[in-house]
């Protein structure tokens, strides 16, 4: 992808994924804070132009699904002849009408390291403590879960 500036690259990349990639379910975009503050129009244009049901800035796109409350589904416009990533959405806890997309934004660098990162050193411990909490809910299990995370 040829571009002479970061803002132009963002537009070229947006056009590429919209026009050349299959599916419309989710997209993740890494945007450094400095670029966001220096090029707010380019970032907003990217978010507006992306034809995906979920757009996550600096976050894993699966997080939009895992949160359960945001609407999750393919971008509107799919048909039975070209279903792409599906028709309609799931979750939508707040019963929002005619949702085009969910946009989720977080920091470029996360602390503590999210448990879904492959490099998280205690993900098995976190998962075990989370299952224990689900099995026998108790406020007393939370400190151990938080310390493992």
Residue ranges and their predicted role:
Residues 8-9:
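Long hydrophobic segments that form regular secondary structure
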Residues 14:
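Histidine-anchored nucleotide/phosphate-binding helix
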Residues 4, 20-149:
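C-terminal segments
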């Amino acid at each position: 992808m040829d571009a002479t500036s970061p803002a132009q690259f963002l537009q070229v990349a947006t056009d590429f994924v919209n026009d050349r990639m299959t599916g419309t379910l989710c997209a993740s975009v890494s945007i450094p804070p400095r670029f966001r503050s220096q090029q707010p129009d380019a970032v907003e244009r990217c978010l507006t132009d992306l034809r995906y049901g979920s757009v996550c800035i600096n976050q894993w796109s699966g997080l939009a699904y895992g949160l359960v409350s945001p609407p999750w589904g393919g971008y509107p416009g799919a048909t039975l002849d070209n279903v792409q990533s599906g028709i309609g959405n799931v979750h939508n806890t707040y019963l929002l009408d005619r949702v085009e997309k969910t946009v989720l934004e977080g920091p470029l660098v996360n602390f503590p390291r999210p448990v879904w990162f492959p490099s998280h050193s205690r993900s098995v411990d976190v998962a075990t403590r989370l299952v224990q909490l689900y099995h026998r809910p108790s406020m007393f299990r939370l400190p151990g879960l938080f310390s493992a995370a």
